[in-house]
Amino acid sequence: MIHARIAGTGSYLPGNPVSNDDLVARGIDTSDDWVVSRTGIRTRYLAPPDVGSSDLALVAAQRAIEAAGCAANDIDLIIVATSTPDYIFPSTATLLQSKLGIGNNGAAFDVQAVCSGFVYALSIAEKFIRSGSHKRALVVGAEVFSRILDWTDRATCVLFGDGAGAVVLEASERPGVLTTALHADGSHHPILCVPGNVATGQVVGDPFLRMDGQAVFKFAVKVLGDVAHEVLDAAGVAADSVDWLIPHQANIRIIQATAKRLGLSMEKVVATVDRHGNTSAASIPLALDLAVRDGRIRPGQRVVVEGVGGGFTWGAALIDF
């Protein structure tokens, strides 16, 4: 039987960390105490104007490919999860394919599921590999969310950051990705959205992120707990067999509440929201790569990754690393 396992991870954060006090100095009506007490966020990274999602994705991808011990030309599938693509089209994945110098070698496409995008992309790639149609996939979450923030809205602009994370997923006789679960409920779309588009050369509607924070919190805590239990039950394993939980890094309170629902201590949770802020589809692979490189996540350990994003969309994956 063909399985899909993670062979390498990589990540990239642009520039220097931007603190809450830095935002205050830029004229944002907030304070370090206000942001930290409500979200746990202390810093985030903001890409310069000439850097797009494909640029961030390129560095993260190169690092993941190097960690996997393969060459770029060995990749025959690229899936990029992003809500902030470089262009309306072509896809960021095809731009990344070109920047990697891969050329005509397999498929490349984007997935848009906002903050759960990486879990969606990972699940899709795993299915491609298990089918036998592809052997080595590059799965990337990359975002420049700073481009869609209303910097006069202190309730949202302090929450988000830019970055990219990537994994190389390859065919293996040894199980890696054990189970995945994906869900969506579009009836909740007004709670978290960017309700605008481009038509006839003009921005139609509102081009900035809008969010009902309390509604997002309640929904996220419920579905993240549910979907984590779903992948554990599907694999027939208990929560106490999990070595690490890597949730979407939106808010430390959501992360703490999710861990509590699973009966896991925070010592088993990889939390980077304090350093990275909410990087949407990039948050999970960023946290994963950090924990791999600092030695917390080691071969043979069991990891749950999970995310929830606008739509709403949500999902989880159980992985033997």
Curated annotation (Swiss-Prot):
Q: Which GO terms describe its biological process?
A: fatty acid biosynthetic process
User: What EC number(s) is this enzyme filed under?
Assistant: 2.3.1.180
Q: Which keywords does this Swiss-Prot/TrEMBL entry list?
A: Acyltransferase, Cytoplasm, Fatty acid biosynthesis, Fatty acid metabolism, Lipid biosynthesis, Lipid metabolism, Multifunctional enzyme, Transferase
Keyword Cytoplasm in annotation:
yes
Reaction(s) this enzyme catalyzes, per UniProt: malonyl-[ACP] + acetyl-CoA + H(+) = 3-oxobutanoyl-[ACP] + CO2 + CoA
The record's subunit annotation is: Homodimer.
Q: What is known of its domains?
A: The last Arg residue of the ACP-binding site is essential for the weak association between ACP/AcpP and FabH.
Q: Which named protein is this?
A: Beta-ketoacyl-[acyl-carrier-protein] synthase III
Protein source organism: Azoarcus sp. (strain BH72)
